[in-house]
């Protein structure tokens, strides 16, 4: 009898783990209409000027099925609130200096690169047979440098989920974004806590946790410096199916930071379009976009190292 109970419990736990892998679905007009209804009616701050935002959605590595849904979310937020105008592109030459000047901010949408090199720009340039190997490497470095300089000089940058992998082995890119992708345990239900419940950037959550199914991203490189203002965190002791021990109980999954004269917003949620079916995440995205555009003012001073892991 006891053995049967153990087997039954094991089966239930296994079923729960499998169910955490949400079903993918194609972007449809019906889904977009649902998002339009859930999205904020107006922006938190009325923009003082017209903003144009580049949404870059090219990937060469892992194909996140949520890419078109994330594009749609940014379009809905822009059109419904009038907070900014969006232009979509998968052309790396948008990172030429003359082109970046046309935008007030850039949104990087799940731009996963091919491992282990992890250089999306070089992935694309490798296909250009008119260039030598040296020319490809030089151009890739130039385009990356252009984006970094753009933010340093005052441009905004919003980095969504897997986009942190775009130039994952570049320390310069890591320092701009606030970290690099390390790995993630399997998809599972994650409870995201608010680092500062009264911070303007987490107003969307109304002081409550945000529970959803996602990949629990963990980070390295510049992340260890904690040179950012954390917004959301997860308790790693509650994660399941960890392939190795995690060094800190608290890991941040979203933050803001100054970078030169510019502003950066990293948001790990979400791998799944279902997460956007909660209006709170839509407002969080909108507020983050308004932050990088300079409209939503808030404390973005870096956390103190001695505060790491304390809430």
Stretches with model-predicted labels:
Residues 53-54, 100-167, 261:
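Short alpha-beta junction capping motif
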Residues 1-22:
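Bacterial Sec-dependent N-terminal signal peptides
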Residues 82-96:
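A short, well-structured beta->alpha microelement
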Residues 60-72:
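Glycine- and acidic-residue-enriched helix-capping/strand-helix junction motifs
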Residues 32-39, 174-175, 179-260:
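Catalytic beta-strand/loop cores that center a nucleophilic Ser/Cys/Thr
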Residues 21-48, 68, 76-81, 238-240, ...:
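Extracellular ligand-binding/catalytic regions of CAZymes and related secreted enzymes
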Residues 59-62, 92-94, 111-115, 157, ...:
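Solvent-exposed loop/turn segments at secondary-structure junctions
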Residues 50-61:
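Short beta-strand segments enriched in small/hydrophobic residues
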């Amino acid at each position: 009898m006891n053995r049967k109970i153990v087997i039954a419990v094991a089966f239930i736990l296994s079923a729960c783990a499998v169910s955490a892998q949400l079903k993918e679905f194609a972007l449809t007009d019906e889904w977009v209409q649902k998002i339009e209804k859930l999205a904020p009616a107006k922006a938190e701050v009325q923009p003082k000027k017209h903003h144009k935002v580049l949404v870059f959605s090219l990937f060469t590595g892992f194909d996140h099925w949520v890419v078109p849904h994330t594009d749609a979310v940014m379009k809905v937020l822009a059109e419904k609130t009038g907070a900014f105008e969006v232009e979509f592109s998968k052309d790396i030459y948008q990172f030429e200096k003359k082109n970046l000047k046309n935008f007030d901010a850039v949104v990087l949408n799940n731009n996963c690169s091919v491992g282990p090199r992890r250089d999306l720009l070089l992935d694309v340039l490798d296909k250009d047979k008119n260039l030598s190997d040296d020319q490809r490497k030089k151009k890739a470095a130039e385009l990356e440098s252009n984006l970094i300089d753009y933010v340093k000089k005052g441009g905004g940058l919003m980095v969504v989920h897997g986009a942190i992998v775009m130039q994952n082995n570049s320390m310069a890119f890591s320092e701009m974004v606030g970290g690099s992708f390390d790995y993630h345990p399997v998809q599972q239900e994650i409870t995201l806590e608010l680092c500062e419940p009264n911070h303007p950037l987490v107003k969307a959550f109304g002081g409550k946790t945000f529970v959803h199914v996602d990949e629990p991203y963990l980070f390295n490189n510049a992340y260890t410096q904690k040179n950012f203002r954390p917004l959301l965190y997860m308790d790693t002791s509650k994660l399941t199916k960890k392939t190795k021990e995690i060094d800190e109980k608290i890991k941040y999954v979203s933050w803001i930071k100054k970078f030169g004269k510019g502003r950066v917003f990293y948001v790990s949620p979400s791998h799944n379009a279902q997460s956007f079916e909660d209006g709170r995440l839509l407002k969080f995205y909108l507020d983050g976009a308004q932050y990088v555009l300079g409209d939503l003012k808030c404390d973005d001073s870096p956390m103190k190292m001695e505060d790491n892991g304390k809430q």
